[in-house]
UniProtKB/Swiss-Prot annotation:
GN (gene name): GALT31A
Protein location: Golgi apparatus membrane
This protein's name: Beta-1,6-galactosyltransferase GALT31A
GO CC aspect terms: Golgi membrane
Biological processes, Gene Ontology terms: embryo development ending in seed dormancy; protein glycosylation
Role, per record: Beta-galactosyltransferase involved in elongation of beta-1,6-linked galactan side chains on arabinogalactan proteins. Required for the progression of embryogenesis beyond the globular stage. Beta-galactosyltransferase involved in the biosynthesis of type II arabinogalactan. Transfers galactose from UDP-galactose to a mixture of various oligosaccharides derived from arabinogalactan proteins. Forms a complex with GALT29A that can work cooperatively to enhance the activities of adding galactose residues at O6 positions to beta-1,6-linked galactan and beta-1,3-linked galactan.
Entry EC no(s): 2.4.1.-
Taxonomic lineage from the root: Eukaryota, Viridiplantae, Streptophyta, Embryophyta, Tracheophyta
Residues in the Lumenal compartment per record: 36-399
Disruption phenotype: Embryonic lethality, due to the arrest of embryo development at the globular stage.
Length: 399
């Protein structure tokens, strides 16, 4: 019994000591926590009660972060980075275009094409940088048409050279050679070229039914010779205001792939013997269907990338009977912006005259009924006098 009483007392003693220790520990821990909390409250209260001078000093030592300003800086940097990427993309695209052009020219040089072989020999020279190149399509029999243009809207002699150096504009009559090279027709053109210095000769046999081929060769040869923003094709019975044309093109200068003209969609003519007959009419669906939208052939412009595309792929591009349809078909499956600009297809007086008087001179004028100016040799001067923008307009224009 004595032993049991001792064990019970010992057990009770140990428990009491542990309880005492735990109580003291809890008290001390509580005091510590309360002191910490009181210190925090005093700090916050001190900040709130601090004087304006103390607050300013605190801000100077610990400046606040302007989150809105920081967010604006980030957005600005992102925008700048995006612009840099776009510039690099454009540069890479231009280099790819240059490489493709050089390869195509070198390939043609190996094929023995005289016109392009000369271009290959000139590849060591840097192509002149130009605003636009205008090719005026003409024929051996069109001397009077050429003279009517030289006497109106086409600068001559030193003025033509000045146009190139000051405005970056190349203008040439475009013609190939006869079916008998070195014959009378070719000698006549050579003599005319010696006099006016305004021809661009192609390695092409002239013929009315070869206009699609001539157009293709023109763009390929022009892009190999001149590095321009735009390449223009115009017929030799159309009146052009160069200042207005330049201003029109300048609005689209930053776009990589543009096709500018008066867009139309005429009927596909299946009947043989009619003008503009389409032998491959069946490709366009049922009889009576219309062509896809394309620029009318009197005048249109394409950007450098598209001219290069024609040059690189000319062996693969299909030619239809009509030149304007052929050109439109080459772009129909590409990422190209078609720009329908009606200032490029004004009618002759009174239409273009009224628009000029209203302060909106036309870029080009012709008669739809004649697919050009009717009796252009006789009427070109009249159209120029009544619809022209003024001979000095091109020199006062800034592109």
């Amino acid at each position: 019994m004595g032993m049991g009483r001792y064990q019970k007392s010992a057990t009770s003693g140990v428990s009491a000591r542990w309880v005492f220790v735990l109580c003291i520990s809890s008290f001390l821990l509580g005091v510590l926590v309360v002191n910490r909390l009181l210190a925090s409250f005093e700090t916050v209260d001190g900040i709130e009660r601090a004087s304006p001078e103390q607050n300013d000093q605190s801000r100077s030592l610990n400046p606040l972060v302007d989150c809105e300003s920081k967010e604006g800086d980030i957005l600005s940097r992102v925008s700048h980075t995006h612009d840099v990427i776009k510039t690099l993309d454009k540069t890479i695209s231009s280099l790819e275009v240059e490489l493709a052009t050089a390869r195509a020219a070198r390939s043609d040089g190996r094929d023995g094409s005289p016109a392009v072989a000369k271009t290959v020999a000139d590849q060591s020279k840097i192509r002149p940088r130009m605003f636009f190149v205008m090719g005026i399509m003409t024929a051996f029999s069109s001397r009077k048409r050429r003279d009517s243009i030289r006497g109106t809207w086409l600068p001559k002699g030193d003025e033509l050279k000045r146009l190139e150096t000051e405005k970056g504009i190349i203008m040439r009559f475009v013609i190939g050679h006869s079916s008998s090279p070195g014959g009378v027709l070719d000698h006549t053109i050579e003599a005319e070229e010696e006099q006016h210095k305004d021809f661009f000769r192609l390695n092409h046999i002239e013929g009315y039914h070869e206009l699609s081929s001539k157009t293709q060769i023109y763009f390929s040869s022009a892009v190999a010779k001149w590095d321009a923003d735009f390449y223009i094709k115009v017929d030799d019975d159309v009146h052009v205001n160069l200042g207005m044309l330049g201003s029109t093109l300048a609005r689209h200068r930053s776009k990589p792939r543009v096709y500018i003209g008066c867009m139309k969609s005429g009927p596909v003519l299946a009947q043989k013997g009619v003008k503009y007959h389409e032998p491959e009419y069946w490709k366009f669906g049922e009889e009576g269907n219309k062509y896809f939208r394309h620029a009318t052939g009197q005048i249109y412009a394409i950007s450098k990338d598209l001219a290069t595309y024609i040059s690189v792929n000319r062996q693969l591009l299909h030619k239809y009977a009509n030149e304007d349809v052929s050109l439109g078909s080459w772009f129909i499956g590409l990422d190209v912006e078609h720009i329908d600009d009606r200032s490029l297809c004004c009618g002759t007086p009174l239409d273009c005259e009224w628009k000029g008087q209203a302060g909106n001179p036309c870029a080009a004028s012709f008669d739809w009924s004649c697919s050009g100016i009717c009796k252009s040799v006789d009427r070109m001067l009249e159209v120029h006098q009544r619809c022209g923008e003024g001979d000095g307009a091109i020199w006062h224009s800034s592109f």
